From Swiss-Prot:
Positions of the pro-segment in this chain: 17-28
Record-listed substrate binding positions: 147
GO molecular function: glucan 1,4-alpha-glucosidase activity; hydrolase activity, hydrolyzing O-glycosyl compounds
GO terms for cellular component: cell surface; endoplasmic reticulum; fungal-type vacuole; Golgi apparatus; prospore membrane
Record flagged with keyword Glycoprotein: yes
Keywords (A to Z) from UniProt: Carbohydrate metabolism, Glycoprotein, Glycosidase, Hydrolase, Meiosis, Polysaccharide degradation, Signal
Name of this protein: Probable glucoamylase
Catalytic activity: Hydrolysis of terminal (1->4)-linked alpha-D-glucose residues successively from non-reducing ends of the chains with release of beta-D-glucose
Lineage, broadest ranks: Eukaryota, Fungi, Dikarya, Ascomycota, Taphrinomycotina
Organism per entry: Schizosaccharomyces pombe (strain 972 / ATCC 24843) (Fission yeast)
Length: 450
């Protein structure tokens, strides 16, 4: 399988030009063909950022997942707990689908995370505060510079990733006593989450210290997954703790719905921001539930960014983090579209299609009618087959933007210019590849369904 990834990195790439040219699309390359090729290309680029065998990750700790090989302007050559967990979850999904050659990477990642938990750092140590530390050096030592600390989504996401793999192990005959070190790590992260979820921490963009929608959403999932996990390993006290934490988190999440704007806000009480933020899309993707309010939120984001970004001409739907963004990838000037956000917008729609395929269309309300009417024909918002087809096209347009602005070899940085689409910021961002793969496989999962 790794040979296949390397082959795709060296050649055989469906070009964005052939994909996007209306006259060539049907003859030379379809979206299906491009996404099929990107499975190997994006996976290859992503694995290049994982130590100690990746092309960009030589001579670093085994299992260390670097955010990017960029060491200057900007310097992202660190391992973030969040980014690493999200990356390994993408790898776990491929492993569960049969790519067993990925298992050594998963094991090395988990062992590296166990080590990092015990490293004293500016946030504290294993017993007091240290699990909220957001990033570490690639040799596994503490990063002691100034940073946005703590980031309390990190231990929750790490616990979710660990539980995914350990549930697989238990289902395939592994005994609890064989993985006690990993169990200790999971319970530590879950206990931290249960005891600190009410506290302000920095958001996933590392800019605002507050209570955030994304952080709460992944903390809720950690408590849900953790409840079942604790019961499975025979830890009833922890199971009870996690169980009783779920409802208050859920109630807090409800406070982020703004009926006046008709959107879920990423944060509240900021006079300098509307609260419209791509982080809410990511929260929906990494949670266990599907909140129907996420669709009008996505539409509002897309319409705002289509208006604000000159690069969004015609069908293009490049997505950035939030309308007021000023981070240009290196310094502060003006924000740009991000590959993470653009791919995740597509994935949200594919997830919604799968949900409505199973559940049927919801009751129309003043909040969702605009979304469904956008995809209806002849004013009929109840014809699911028509709405589904048009939603799928809408989702594919996000991926077409990714195809146009990635490099010919499939490489993706963090951002691309809002003006001309040239890539900006940290090169070969691991999360960019992870988010694209997630969208592609979510798209594949709804093929053939009605």
């Amino acid at each position: 399988m790794r040979t296949y990834w390397l082959f795709l990195l060296l050649g055989g790439v469906v070009s964005a030009e052939s994909l996007l040219s209306p006259n060539k699309r049907s003859k030379e390359a379809s979206m299906d063909e491009w996404t099929d090729q990107q499975k190997g290309i994006a996976m290859g680029h992503m694995l290049n950022n994982i130590g100690d065998s990746g092309m960009h990750a030589k001579d670093i700790n085994p299992g260390c997942i670097i955010a990017s090989p960029s060491t200057d302007s900007p310097d992202y050559y660190y391992q973030w707990v969040r980014d690493s967990a999200l990356t390994i979850m993408t790898i776990l999904d491929r492993f569960f689908e049969g790519d067993k050659g990925l298992e050594p990477i998963i094991v090395k990642y988990m062992d590296e995370m166990v080590r990092l938990q015990k490293v004293p750092n500016p946030s504290g140590d294993f017993y007091a505060g240290g699990l909220g530390e957001p990033k570490f050096n690639v040799d596994g030592t503490s990063y002691d510079g100034d940073w946005g600390r703590p980031q309390n989504d990190s231990p929750a996401l790490r616990a979710i990733a660990f539980i995914k793999y350990m549930n697989y192990l238990f289902e395939n005959g592994k005994e609890v006593h064989e993985v006690t070190v990993w169990i200790e790590a999971v319970l530590a992260d879950l206990d931290y989450t249960a005891n600190h979820w009410t506290e302000a921490s920095f958001d996933l963009w590392e800019e605002i210290k507050d209570v955030h929608y994304f952080t709460l959403a992944v903390q809720k999932r950690a408590m849900q997954d953790g409840t079942a996990f604790a019961k499975r390993i025979g830890a009833p006290d922890q199971a009870a703790l996690y169980q009783r934490t779920i409802e208050p988190i859920d109630l807090k999440l409800g406070e982020f719905w703004d009926p006046g704007m008709g959107v879920i806000k990423g944060y509240k009480g900021r006079v300098d921001r509307s609260g419209l933020d791509c982080s809410t899309l990511l929260a929906s993707l990494y949670s266990n539930e599907f909140d129907m309010h996420i669709l009008p939120t996505l539409l509002k984001l897309q319409e705002t960014m289509t208006r604000d970004y000159p690069v969004n001409q015609g069908w293009k739907q490049a997505m950035g983090r939030y309308p007021e963004d000023v981070y240009d990838g290196v310094s502060k000037s003006i924000g740009n579209p991000w590959f993470i956000c653009t791919s995740s917008a597509a994935e949200i729609i594919y997830k919604a299609i799968a949900y409505y395929d199973n559940k049927g269309l919801p009751e129309l309300t003043e909040y969702n009618i605009h979304f469904f009417m956008k995809f209806a024909e002849f004013g009929d918002p109840y014809n699911w087959s028509v709405i589904r087809k048009n939603m799928h096209t809408y989702a594919d347009n996000f991926l077409k933007a990714v195809a146009e602005f990635q490099h010919p070899n499939g490489s993706m940085s963090e951002q691309f210019s809002r003006d001309d689409g040239h890539q900006k910021g940290a090169r070969d961002l691991t999360w960019s590849y992870s988010s694209l793969l997630n969208a592609i496989y979510r798209r594949e999962a709804i093929k053939g369904s009605v």
